[in-house]
């Protein structure tokens, strides 16, 4: 079964939590330790990547270390065409739709496509939208930031992504953002699309995660909170416990 199908099946019964690990922030061994504690806490998938350009060697080392120490599927979350590892299970083949730079919309994707065709990893088409404040990814990706409360612009991009055939949409406030994308925007967009919505950035406590999930996020991503914590298991267990407690009434 493909990872995308696993996600869709799981979403019929529960929300999904993914832990994002940035190889630029931690050594491969440290990344593996975070992933192991995240697995024990109940995370569903590990994402590896970030907005800082990282070479293939470091990506390989990090993904391999995580695979050796956990039973979780690893999904690449690349910031450029260099951030690919043959050891991963899948890649979010993503387009930063609100970038002002063609490279982040389709350029890096074109550069990586031939190499990816040689690898046995799953490619998951995903639309990536960066909201204010954007943080590093907004700057590096030259994003025309969407205001967190501008639900009409968010909806226009999201519907365009759905009509173009993307399988997932990711709302990003930026790693380390002081707050996540507005719950009103999430709820409004989710009510009008029929593909899964991922939300990340600014989610660092159980209460915030719960609000974002209840607003309509199908998948919650946390990254910085795990990187900075001395007790990854405890921090993530509280967050994951909250979102997993939500009763699913309508399947995606």
Curated annotation (Swiss-Prot):
It catalyses: sn-glycerol 1-phosphate + (2E,6E,10E)-geranylgeranyl diphosphate = sn-3-O-(geranylgeranyl)glycerol 1-phosphate + diphosphate. It is found in: Cytoplasm. InterPro entries: GGGP/HepGP_synthase_I, GGGP/HepGP_synthase_sf, GGGP_HepGP_synthase, GGGP_synth. GO terms for cellular component: cytoplasm. Sn-glycerol 1-phosphate binds at residues 170-176, 201-202, 223-224. Signal peptide: none annotated. Keywords: Cytoplasm, Lipid biosynthesis, Lipid metabolism, Magnesium, Metal-binding, Phospholipid biosynthesis, Phospholipid metabolism, Transferase. Pathway: Membrane lipid metabolism; glycerophospholipid metabolism. Gene3D superfamilies: FMN-linked oxidoreductases. Its EC number is 2.5.1.41. Its cofactor is Mg(2+). It holds the Pfam family PcrB. Mg(2+) binds at residues 22, 51. One of its GO terms (molecular function) is magnesium ion binding. GO terms for biological process: glycerophospholipid biosynthetic process. PANTHER family: HEPTAPRENYLGLYCERYL PHOSPHATE SYNTHASE, PTHR40029. Belongs to the GGGP/HepGP synthase family. Group II subfamily. Prenyltransferase that catalyzes the transfer of the geranylgeranyl moiety of geranylgeranyl diphosphate (GGPP) to the C3 hydroxyl of sn-glycerol-1-phosphate (G1P). This reaction is the first ether-bond-formation step in the biosynthesis of archaeal membrane lipids. This is Geranylgeranylglyceryl phosphate synthase.
